[in-house]
Structure formats: structure tokens, C-alpha cells
């Protein structure tokens, strides 16, 4: 725990009443304060990898895509993505290896999930040796317009 000393000019009611009201120089009161660092936790999508995600495609729920990538899209555009086939090229930064990869985010009109497909297997599963049970996290970086990816728990 980090401790810091702050000085305040505020007095308790008793101190205020007992001091001379004509004296403009109020004493400063030191207070030792504990500062708890707030851990930055950016992960908007956290998934435990399944067999299907290791051999086929990485599923991303529509709600997560809507809340991240499509946060600033119009309601009409979001409504359209629910019933249409969508495919877009995206960048995914692997924060553990500091590499950037291209991927295709795809959505079938009958499914309610988006998916990273072919590039997911080559660029992440094989290269990073991902296995069933690993926990991965992703978040959308608005400044760089890309997903950021990391293995949060590599235990099997």
C-alpha cells in the first residue's frame, strides 16, 4: 500500500469553534492517506477456449462487437448487421508478442455471433500454440482501430 501525506485546511467543528475567528491563519492539518492503485483491466471480451475455437473459428458475441467496434455506429447499421452476411478485414495486435496480424471478421446472417476464421488458426492457434482451456482476452483499441489480444491464463 502506498502512503502519502496530505495537508488540509479543513477543521473539525470543535476546532473551528475553539479557534479565534479573527485570526485568518488557520493551521494546516497533516493526514496520512493510503493510496490504492487501481489495476487497469481493459478486457472487454474474455473467453475460455473451446475445442471448436481451436480447430475452427473464434466466436465473438454480437453484443460484444456492438459494444466495442460498433459503439459509434447508427442503430440502423447495427440492425442491418443482425440480418445480413458481413465480412470485414480487421487488425489484431498480439500484446504478448507485440505483433500485428490481419484477420477477417465474418458473420453469417443465421448466426448471432461474429467469427475470426482462417487467419485465427494460422496467426494465433498454431503460432501461439493455443490449447483448449486457455483464457484469452480482447478489447477494441479506438485510437488504433484494432483489436488487442492477449493470453490471460495459459494453464490447461
Swiss-Prot record:
One MF annotation (Gene Ontology) recorded for this entry: DNA binding
Binding region for DNA: 57-155
Official protein name in the record: B3 domain-containing protein At5g26805
Protein location: Nucleus
Gene3D superfamilies recorded: DNA-binding pseudobarrel domain (2.40.330.10)
GO cellular component: nucleus
Classification of source organism: Eukaryota, Viridiplantae, Streptophyta, Embryophyta, Tracheophyta
CDD domains: B3_DNA (cd10017)
PANTHER family xref list: GENOME ASSEMBLY, CHROMOSOME: A02 (PTHR34269:SF5), TRANSCRIPTION FACTOR B3-DOMAIN FAMILY-RELATED (PTHR34269)
UniProt source species: Arabidopsis thaliana (Mouse-ear cress)
Entry keyword set: DNA-binding, Nucleus, Transcription, Transcription regulation
InterPro entries, sorted: B3_DNA-bd, B3_domain, DNA-bd_pseudobarrel_sf
